[in-house]
């Protein structure tokens, strides 16, 4: 099973190099993050996106912050910086876990005992570990997913939503990583990729990855999924996750919830592919997941799409009248009752219950 050749995150010469996903697929360009503030900007403005990639970028942001110092800040100053990082994208739990992992290694109780050099070294080691761990976990997750499909090479039709491939992770992917691994196992695939309004991650990113991987695919608008399921045999819907509550309720890119409802109606298995880093056992269900509200302009215009010079590709007002108000929740929550199974690096959870989730992650 091969990893993707796409590398959205590179650590080179103590600088973080990020593939600028705002300008894909028209332009392939990279930006260099030299400070924590650069990383916060990259996360908030979606230069980098996808819960695992956000967390890894955040970890390297912490490294860049420490590398910029000539003396240790007070612990209160450090907490403020970490808080600013956390606020850049609040829904995905992965970023919070990365910050907490750093904090657990250098806790307030014995913060004074660590030298600046020790923390600089430890921060970089953690970020590099997270980069390699995510790739390994994605590959393992994909191996487990193969058991859900025929052992013999078959023709499979799959629907996916948003972007969950190499661009969203350390380099293989969760849901799209599963699709890639099914192809590598000899299956003949046809993938229907939701365009994923309003930010068009499916149209701009997933479609691009599928073409790069030479996987047969069709781009569909989000509201075509019902037509696709009713007009041809669909073997599975596979999506990713930004946060999974204790009971299995799953926050993912807006539009996932209605896709799950349509899949349930048509008897199509609906799978979530995610690693343990997307689990949040501190919350009982999806109602506790904070939903990020983004700018209205992402709904009312395509001005957020930039060319290689950073200029808007289209003028404001081409989609909706100027002054029209819009709602723009970036995520919705799919109830566990609509999810056939959650594919993880520890195995497959099905049926999706709190007890089964805790068992597979050895919490009970």
Swiss-Prot record:
Q: Name one GO molecular function term.
A: S-methyl-5-thioribose-1-phosphate isomerase activity
Q: Name one Pfam family in it.
A: IF-2B
Query: What UniProt keywords apply to this chain's record, in alphabetical order?
Result: Amino-acid biosynthesis, Isomerase, Methionine biosynthesis
- State the source organism's domain of life: Bacteria
- Which GO biological process categories is it annotated with? L-methionine salvage from methylthioadenosine
Residues given in the record as substrate binding sites: 49-51, 89, 201, 252-253
Keyword check for Protein transport: no
Site, Transition state stabilizer: residue positions: 162
Reactions the enzyme catalyzes: 5-(methylsulfanyl)-alpha-D-ribose 1-phosphate = 5-(methylsulfanyl)-D-ribulose 1-phosphate
Name the active site residues: 242
Write down the InterPro entries for this protein, in alphabetical order: IF-2B-related, IF-M1Pi, IF_2B-like_C, Initiation_fac_2B_a/b/d, M1Pi_N, NagB/RpiA_transferase-like
Q: In which pathway does it act?
A: Amino-acid biosynthesis; L-methionine biosynthesis via salvage pathway; L-methionine from S-methyl-5-thio-alpha-D-ribose 1-phosphate: step 1/6
Q: What is its EC number?
A: 5.3.1.23
Do you know which HAMAP family this protein is assigned to? Salvage_MtnA
Tell me the function of this protein: Catalyzes the interconversion of methylthioribose-1-phosphate (MTR-1-P) into methylthioribulose-1-phosphate (MTRu-1-P).
Family to which this protein belongs: Belongs to the eIF-2B alpha/beta/delta subunits family. MtnA subfamily.
Identify this protein by name.
Methylthioribose-1-phosphate isomerase
């Amino acid at each position: 099973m091969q990893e993707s050749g796409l590398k959205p995150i590179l650590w080179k010469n103590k600088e973080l190099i990020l593939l600028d996903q705002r300008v894909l697929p028209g332009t392939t360009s990279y930006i260099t993050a030299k400070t924590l503030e650069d990383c916060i900007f990259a996360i908030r403005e979606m230069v980098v996106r996808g819960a695992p990639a956000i967390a890894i970028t955040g970890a390297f942001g912490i490294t860049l912050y420490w590398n910029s110092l000539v003396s240790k800040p007070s612990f209160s100053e450090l907490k403020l910086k970490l808080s600013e990082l956390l606020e850049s994208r609040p829904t995905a739990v992965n970023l919070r876990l990365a910050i907490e992992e750093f904090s657990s290694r250098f806790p307030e109780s014995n913060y004074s005992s660590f030298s600046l050099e020790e923390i600089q070294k430890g921060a970089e080691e953690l970020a590099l570990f997270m980069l390699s761990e995510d790739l390994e976990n994605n590959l393992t997750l994909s191996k487990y997913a193969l058991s859900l499909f025929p052992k013999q090479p078959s023709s499979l039709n799959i629907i996916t939503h948003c972007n969950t491939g190499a661009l969203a992770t350390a380099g293989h992917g969760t849901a799209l990583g599963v699709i890639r691994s099914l192809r590598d196992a000899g299956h003949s695939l046809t993938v229907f990729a939701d365009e994923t309004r309003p930010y068009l991650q499916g149209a701009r990113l997933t479609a691009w990855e599928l073409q790069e991987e030479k996987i047969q695919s069709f781009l569909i608008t989000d509201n075509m999924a019902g037509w696709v399921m009713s007009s041809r045999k669909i073997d599975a819907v596979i999506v990713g996750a930004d946060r999974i509550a204790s009971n299995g309720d799953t926050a993912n890119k807006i539009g996932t919830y209605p896709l799950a409802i349509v899949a349930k109606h048509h008897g199509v298995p609906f799978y979530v592919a995610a690693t343990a880093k997307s689990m949040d056992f501190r919350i009982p269900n999806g109602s506790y997941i904070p939903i990020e509200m983004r700018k209205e302009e992402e709904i009312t215009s395509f001005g957020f799409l930039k060319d290689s010079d950073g200029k808007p590709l289209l003028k404001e007002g081409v989609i909706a009248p100027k002054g029209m108000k819009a709602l723009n929740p970036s995520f919705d929550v799919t109830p566990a009752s609509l999810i056939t199974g959650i594919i993880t690096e520890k195995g497959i959870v099905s049926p999706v219950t709190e007890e089964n989730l805790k068992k597979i992650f050895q919490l009970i």
